[in-house]
Amino acid sequence: MTKLVNEMILVLDFGSQYNQLITRRIREFGVYSELHPHTLTAEEIKKMNPKGIILSGGPNSVYDEGSFRCDEKIFELDIPVLGICYGMQLMTHYLGGKVEAASQREYGKANIHIEGEPDLFKDLPNEQVVWMSHGDLVVEVPEGFTVDATSHHCPNSAMSKKDKKWYGVQFHPEVRHSEYGNDLLKNFVFGVCECVGEWSMENFIEIEMQKIRETVGDKQVLCALSGGVDSSVVAVLIHKAIGDQLTCIFVDHGLLRKGEAEGVMKTFSEGFNMNVIKVDAKDRFLNKLKGVSDPEQKRKIIGNEFIYVFDDEAEKLKGIDFLAQGTLYTDIIESGTATAQTIKSHHNVGGLPEDMQFELIEPLNTLFKDEVRALGTELGIPDEIVWRQPFPGPGLGIRVLGEVTEEKLEIVRESDAILREEIAKADLEKDIWQYFTVLPDIRSVGVMGDARTYDYTIGIRAVTSIDGMTSDWARIPWDVLEKISTRIVNEVKHINRVVYDITSKPPATIEWE
């Protein structure tokens, strides 16, 4: 850890798709936190000098062959440890308690009763609702532990060994359905680990600028600039750190939103006085995508082609050693880790070719989207960029379902522009996390001008969210939806039907592909 971080909570990853929320919650308290693989050794952890360790949840049973484990010597480090769900079971298993398969798997809300006045539940109600998600449970706590909470199906819902500062909870405090989950985590972070809470985006900027300078030295960096908030923040942060050692490459792959290419060049080459090279690669990308309809294959093709374009440009520039990308925590999470299943590959993660010529710099890969926006504001980036709609690296290539053609791209481009205009007119931009149109590869019968039509359907996707890990469909007023639908059908060629996606995440992802 860099010396600019005085206190840190370490989270060990045992495979839950949502264990990164633990890290996020702790950062919200003003305490720096990082997620690392469960394979870290006790010696490595000791060098990191965390104020506390959290063992995350995960899908395994402690008795499964090949189940995820951690170094048992963690419990000899004299550092407070909190085990969550599988983390509690693993702690129990290592310290001599007993874990068994539950007679009934427990998923969802549960009521727990607090016993006595345990540290984790200080100043919290004796009865509270928590979120359970487990198939095994602790049937016998290790010697010296006390039972701190019970529930109907889980008699040992929480446990502790106060003198060692070891704690376990069978439920998930990081999930918002646990009504006092944040308070419990605060009690661990501030009460048990004695953190102060002085970490901020200002600290993050100092830390990352120092890391960038140490990594890059006097070498040159290429930044993959798209004009979206992620790559914009990366570009400004790196430019602030190393100045003219940064060259931004903006690839117009023909998969951008309406007016986006012109806007990017104006904003960054003029507004931020950066060296920006525009590459017109539309034909190159569309030729590669010809005949391809599988979404994963499209993502991989676009990711690969991006890197090859940069390779070509770097060769022209000479002496480029690093490639900067706006990869976020959520990109890495959804692309899968050694412990988490892949949901879908992100072009910043899963689409990288093995023969890549650059070393990657990804200064945002520990941040969630809302943290990136806060960072952008701290860096002085204008609101119109900081609050720009999230836009995937593969662009409209994954908003055209099935094979990508110029005609289909134009349909999505025009319909999306109408959607954005009407959302802006209704002053809903900051109320909705993300909104866009998609073109499913389906046609339906319609009637326009007394004539039968057989044309495409446009889908509208709009969601509310905090960090992109989970989301709900946005309740856009009906009159606004009516205007959007009417304009799209009347102004966009080959569209005779508009539908609104009312699915949350999970079970759906925000993007359709």
Curated annotation (Swiss-Prot):
It catalyses: XMP + L-glutamine + ATP + H2O = GMP + L-glutamate + AMP + diphosphate + 2 H(+). GO terms for molecular function: ATP binding; GMP synthase activity. Residues 199-388 form the GMPS ATP-PPase domain. Its EC number is 6.3.5.2. One of its GO terms (cellular component) is cytosol. Residues 8-198 form the Glutamine amidotransferase type-1 domain. Pathway: Purine metabolism; GMP biosynthesis; GMP from XMP (L-Gln route): step 1/1. ATP binds at residues 226-232. Homodimer. This is GMP synthase [glutamine-hydrolyzing]. It comes from Bacillus licheniformis (strain ATCC 14580 / DSM 13 / JCM 2505 / CCUG 7422 / NBRC 12200 / NCIMB 9375 / NCTC 10341 / NRRL NRS-1264 / Gibson 46). The lineage of its organism: Bacteria, Bacillati, Bacillota, Bacilli, Bacillales.
